[in-house]
UniProtKB/Swiss-Prot annotation:
Entries under InterPro entries matching the protein: Ribosomal_uL15, Ribosomal_uL15/eL18, Ribosomal_uL15/eL18_sf, Ribosomal_uL15_bac-type, Ribosomal_uL15_CS
Function: Binds to the 23S rRNA.
Gene: rplO
Source organism of this protein record: Photorhabdus laumondii subsp. laumondii (strain DSM 15139 / CIP 105565 / TT01)
This protein's name: Large ribosomal subunit protein uL15
Record bears the keyword RNA-binding: yes
SUPFAM superfamilies linked to this entry: Ribosomal proteins L15p and L18e
Coiled-coil spans in chain: none
Family: Belongs to the universal ribosomal protein uL15 family.
GO cellular component: a single term: cytosolic large ribosomal subunit
NCBIfam families documented for this protein: rplO_bact
Start and end residues of each stretch annotated as Disordered: 1-53
Keywords: Ribonucleoprotein, Ribosomal protein, RNA-binding, rRNA-binding
GO terms of molecular function: rRNA binding; structural constituent of ribosome
Length: 144
């Protein structure tokens, strides 16, 4: 077997449609577009969501909600993520250094997910009740 002898399996590739190459091809003259109308023209067609002039669904329905700016700079941290952090004191900078949260994050909340098996001091992070109990059960403490 050589590179110049490789070819795709029979039937796995289709030849492209050759449009506008005579009556006998079945795709001559109008090229499968029919006669006249917007869709027969070059660049013809309607935009996504267009309903022929009827008020489209995306404009009939009301707008609602918003994107919280605070949510963009807040992260949830699992207890199991603490294993990747070196040192006994865990704060926002330690989480950023361990690549657990991004550099834009300003607030983090520790949630009860996974296990913690070493005593750590959590400083300056929000902590859920369940995570609070798990950290203290492992011999750690939480500082505000």
């Amino acid at each position: 077997m050589r590179l110049n002898t490789l070819s795709p399996a029979d039937g796995s590739k289709h030849a492209p449609k050759r449009v506008g190459r005579g009556i006998g091809s079945g795709l001559g003259k109008t090229g499968g577009r029919g006669h006249k109308g917007q869709k027969s023209r070059s660049g013809g067609g309607v935009r996504r969501g267009f309903e022929g002039g009827q008020m489209p669904l995306y404009r009939r329905l009301p707008k609602f909600g918003f994107t919280s700016r605070k949510a963009m700079v807040t992260a949830e941290v699992r207890l199991s993520d603490f294993a990747a952090v070196e040192g006994d004191i865990i704060d926002l900078n330690a989480l950023k250094a361990a690549n657990i949260v991004g550099t834009q994050i300003e607030f983090a909340k520790v949630i009860l997910s996974g296990e913690i098996n070493r005593a750590v001091t959590v400083r300056g992070l929000r902590v859920t009740k369940g995570a609070h109990a798990a950290i203290e059960a492992a011999g750690g403490k939480i500082e505000e």
